[in-house]
Amino acid sequence: MIITIGGLPGTGTTTISKLLSEKYGLSHVCAGFIFRDMAKENNMTLQEFSNYAEKNSGVDNEIDRRQVEAAKSGNLILEGRLAGWILKKNDMVPDLSIWLKADPMVRCKRISEREHENVDLALEKMLLREASEKKRYKEIYNIEIDDLSIYDLVIESSKWGATGVFNIIEKAIK
C-alpha cells in the first residue's frame, strides 16, 4: 500500500503520517527529512542548503528521485507537499492520495508552538516560505500547489484535529 500525504506547513502531515505508519506498519518517507539529510550530506546548515536549493533545481530533482525510489518498494507513507504530484509525474498511482489543509492562523499557531517562536514571526516566515515554494513549484514542475484535483481525499485538519483526521483516513482505507 502506498499513501501520499501533502499539505502546507502546520496542517499536520507529519503527525498523521506517523500515526498511519504505526497503525499499518508502513515505512514513513518524508521529503522534508530527505532535504535535511541532503543538507548534512553537503555539510550545510538547513538555511545554507535552502539558499543553495533556490538556485539549484538539482536539489529538487534529487529529492524527487529519492521519493520515487522509495515508492517503488511499496508499503509506505510518502509525505511531502508534492508527493502526490511526483508520483503522478512518474506514472505511479498511490492507493490513496491525501491533502491536508487548515486555516492559515491555525497553521501559524501550530508552527509557532512547534518552533517555539512568536506567532507574528512564525506568520511572516510561513507566508514568505509558501510564496517562495509556490513560485518554485510553478517554475520547476509547472504545478499549481493550489490545484487539489489529483487528491482522493482533502481534509480540513483545523476542524477535525489529529484524531479526527486519522479516523477519516482510516475509514477511507477500509
UniProtKB/Swiss-Prot annotation:
Molecular function as annotated in GO: ATP binding; CMP kinase activity; dCMP kinase activity
Superkingdom: Archaea
Alphabetically ordered keywords of this record: ATP-binding, Cytoplasm, Kinase, Nucleotide-binding, Transferase
EC number: 2.7.4.25
GO cellular component terms, A-Z: cytoplasm
Binding-site residues, ATP: 7-15
GO biological process, one term: pyrimidine nucleotide metabolic process
The UniProt record lists the keyword Transferase: yes
Subcellular location: Cytoplasm
Entry-linked CDD domains: CMPK
Catalytic activity: CMP + ATP = CDP + ADP; dCMP + ATP = dCDP + ADP
Protein family (similarity comment): Belongs to the cytidylate kinase family. Type 2 subfamily.
Protein name: Cytidylate kinase
Protein species of origin: Methanococcus vannielii (strain ATCC 35089 / DSM 1224 / JCM 13029 / OCM 148 / SB)
Source taxonomy: Archaea, Methanobacteriati, Methanobacteriota, Methanomada group, Methanococci
Gene assigned in the entry: cmk
